[in-house]
């Protein structure tokens, strides 16, 4: 095995948490290395309108915000490595990370790997992935211009996807397993307006039992009522999955403490260690540890705290 590339501080992930950590770490002269992962920019790269970023009164696009963050980190001489880490050994010092392209070691590690879209888990869903089934309306919505589509879910992501698609598709159906939305009130109100305009329909209290299709792709979905013995088929050309996310923490299992859903557990912060994990020198920031707030601004704030925590930790090593 080639000798690992050693760095004082490595940041895994390139979303708001990772970029903010890089900015603060660079300003502290920690010479941070960011390993971007496969999806540089994180979930915001597939978010159309960011209307709640402080100071951006007109609003801006998700990719636009991430580009600004990247340029900010670049200006401060953050080094970017385009690689995907698939194995981590946090039980040795320095920490060891194995990627697709190289092996790395570091004295301190900030994990900002975020979360990925969750799928229904149906064999038929997997069979039509990329052939009518998608988890990203902003990525694939264009292909359904003038066609009928459905979105499954009831939270912010599902409503945002439905609203976005309502400007492209001929008709959008939102399928939700509950009898009310979990999305923010403002988003829900916007969706109800689309329903009143006839551009969107909502199918309450139903789940998808099967994705229907042929050699060309998706043709519909088979739905079942969650309480009653009723089923129905819905004819659509595309299905967008928006039922939540799973944290990207698989490579850290049995090393770092996690909750039952796989989110990393961080300390309380009462002693200036808000992002510290159970392993000294390893810090967590953003959606990889937060499944409650899950906002760009909170992820960025945690990235800031992780950099400050890492700085204190590295200082303690130098003083030892």
UniProtKB/Swiss-Prot annotation:
Localization terms from the record: Cytoplasm
UniProt keywords, alphabetically: Cytoplasm, Disulfide bond, FAD, Flavoprotein, NADP, Oxidoreductase, Redox-active center
Gene Ontology biological-process entries: cell redox homeostasis; removal of superoxide radicals
UniProt-recorded Gene Ontology molecular function terms: thioredoxin-disulfide reductase (NADPH) activity
Pfam families with a match to the protein in the record: Pyr_redox_2
EC number(s) from the headed UniProt entry: 1.8.1.9
Enzyme class: oxidoreductase
Coiled coil: none
Details of cofactor binding: Binds 1 FAD per subunit.
UniProt keyword Flavoprotein, yes or no: yes
Complex formation: Homodimer.
Family: Belongs to the class-II pyridine nucleotide-disulfide oxidoreductase family.
Protein name: Thioredoxin reductase
Organism: Coxiella burnetii (strain RSA 493 / Nine Mile phase I)
Gene name as annotated: trxB
């Amino acid at each position: 095995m080639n000798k690992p590339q050693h760095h004082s501080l490595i940041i895994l992930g390139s979303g708001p948490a990772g970029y903010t950590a890089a900015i603060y770490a660079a300003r502290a002269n920690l010479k941070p290395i960011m390993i971007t992962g496969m999806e540089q920019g994180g979930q915001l790269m597939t978010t159309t309108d960011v209307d709640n970023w402080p100071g951006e009164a007109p609003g801006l696009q998700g990719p636009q915000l991430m580009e600004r963050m990247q340029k900010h980190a670049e200006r401060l001489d953050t080094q970017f490595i385009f690689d995907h880490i698939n194995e981590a050994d946090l039980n040795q010092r320095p920490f060891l990370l194995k990627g697709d392209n190289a092996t790395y070691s570091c004295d301190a590690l900030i994990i900002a790997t975020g979360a990925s879209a969750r799928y229904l888990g149906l064999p038929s869903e997997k069979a039509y992935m990329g052939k009518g089934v998608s988890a990203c309306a902003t990525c694939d919505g264009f292909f359904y211009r003038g066609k009928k589509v459905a979105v499954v879910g009831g939270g912010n992501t599902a409503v945002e996807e439905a609203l976005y698609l309502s400007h492209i598709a001929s008709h959008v159906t939102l399928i939700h397993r509950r009898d009310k939305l979990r999305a923010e009130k403002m988003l829900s109100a916007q969706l109800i307006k689309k329903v009143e305009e006839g551009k969107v329909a909502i199918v309450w209290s139903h789940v998808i039992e099967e994705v229907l299709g042929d050699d060309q792709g998706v043709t519909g979905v088979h739905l079942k009522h969650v309480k009653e013995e009723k089923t129905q088929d819905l004819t659509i050309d595309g299905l967008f999955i928006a039922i939540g996310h799973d944290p990207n923490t698989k490579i850290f299992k049995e090393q770092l403490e996690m909750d039952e859903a796989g989110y990393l557990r961080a300390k309380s912060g009462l002693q200036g260690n808000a992002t510290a994990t159970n392993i000294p020198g390893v810090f967590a920031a953003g959606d990889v540890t937060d499944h409650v707030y899950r906002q760009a601004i909170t992820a960025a704030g945690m990235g800031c705290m992780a950099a400050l925590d890492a700085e204190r930790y590295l200082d303690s090593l130098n003083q030892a």
